[in-house]
């Protein structure tokens, strides 16, 4: 069971160890996710030149591949980085932004799954269903499906690729193909701010880098995200002030907030 103590242990470990998270991510969220990693205590590198991918794998603690604003050169960099990480046994977290919305996105995400074998896939319900082979009803990069509607697809995807799958929603779902964990917390304000899903992805990567195992890191990363989001929402007046409050809360996240603002249960 993942207790409050487990979540807090990994929150503290990220601060103590400052894992380097190499993120090849989209233009929309570079600043947002880098600042979130810094607030959590991790160290971001936002490199994407093909020529430096192997070197980045030599210093990183985890790799994030986010397909939000794809171009062919970025796909090349993602594959080079992913293969270098796999060779070094670094955990890779895939964020299949908009999978199902275009053939480029879906094909690229599936290629990463096949060749890189990421440790974690974190997406919304529609993205996960699209990768699992079901009709995901993706609306651009937004989801038309709830996390619970994608449970079966998430389990199938996890079993097929040996990954932990995180399905974000009002209640987050985390599965390794067998066990199913629910993370309850957060705020309705979170989907009103661009980059919150991508932020969850990098926090999962930071937690996986320090956790006892991948499943634990995925669960505690999402729990930290939910706890910070819940408290930040109460301290803000709307989406604009929420962004600032979220970083402040993430930076000062403590055991009491984790205990009071998030619930992790096994389904």
Curated annotation (Swiss-Prot):
It catalyses: 5-(2-hydroxyethyl)-4-methylthiazole + ATP = 4-methyl-5-(2-phosphooxyethyl)-thiazole + ADP + H(+). ATP binds at residues 122, 168. Its EC number is 2.7.1.50. Pathway: Cofactor biosynthesis; thiamine diphosphate biosynthesis; 4-methyl-5-(2-phosphoethyl)-thiazole from 5-(2-hydroxyethyl)-4-methylthiazole: step 1/1. Substrate binds at residues 46, 195. It comes from the Bacteria. GO terms for biological process: thiamine biosynthetic process; thiamine diphosphate biosynthetic process. One of its GO terms (molecular function) is magnesium ion binding. Its cofactor is Mg(2+). Keywords: ATP-binding, Kinase, Magnesium, Metal-binding, Nucleotide-binding, Thiamine biosynthesis, Transferase. It holds the Pfam family HK. CDD domains: THZ_kinase (cd01170). Belongs to the Thz kinase family. Catalyzes the phosphorylation of the hydroxyl group of 4-methyl-5-beta-hydroxyethylthiazole (THZ). HAMAP family: Thz_kinase. This is Hydroxyethylthiazole kinase. It comes from Nitratidesulfovibrio vulgaris (strain ATCC 29579 / DSM 644 / CCUG 34227 / NCIMB 8303 / VKM B-1760 / Hildenborough) (Desulfovibrio vulgaris). The gene is thiM.
């Amino acid at each position: 069971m993942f207790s409050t103590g487990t979540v807090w242990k990994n929150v503290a470990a990220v601060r103590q160890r400052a894992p380097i998270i190499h993120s090849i991510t989209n233009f929309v969220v570079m600043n947002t996710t880098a600042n979130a990693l810094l607030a959590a205590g991790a160290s971001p590198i936002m490199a994407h030149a093909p020529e430096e991918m192997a070197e980045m794998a030599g210093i990183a603690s985890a790799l994030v591949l986010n397909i939000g604003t794809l171009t062919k050169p970025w796909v090349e960099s993602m594959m080079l980085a992913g293969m270098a990480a796999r060779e070094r046994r670094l955990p890779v977290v895939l964020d299949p932004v908009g999978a199902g919305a275009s053939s480029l996105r879906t094909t690229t995400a599936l290629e990463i799954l096949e060749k890189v074998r990421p440790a974690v896939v974190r997406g919304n319900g529609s993205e996960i269903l699209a990768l699992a082979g079901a009709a995901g009803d993706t609306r651009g990069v937004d989801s038309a499906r709830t996390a619970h509607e994608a449970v079966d697809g998430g389990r199938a995807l996890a079993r097929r690729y040996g990954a932990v799958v995180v399905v974000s929603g009002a209640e987050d779902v985390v599965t390794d193909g067998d066990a199913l964990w629910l993370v309850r917390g957060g705020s309705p304000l979170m989907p009103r701010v661009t980059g919150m899903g991508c932020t969850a992805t990098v926090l999962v990567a930071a937690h996986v880098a320090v956790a006892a195992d991948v499943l634990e890191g995925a669960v505690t990363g999402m729990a930290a995200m939910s706890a910070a989001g819940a408290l930040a929402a109460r301290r803000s007046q709307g989406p604009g002030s929420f962004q600032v409050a979220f970083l402040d809360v993430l930076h000062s996240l403590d055991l009491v907030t984790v205990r009071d603002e998030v619930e992790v249960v096994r389904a």
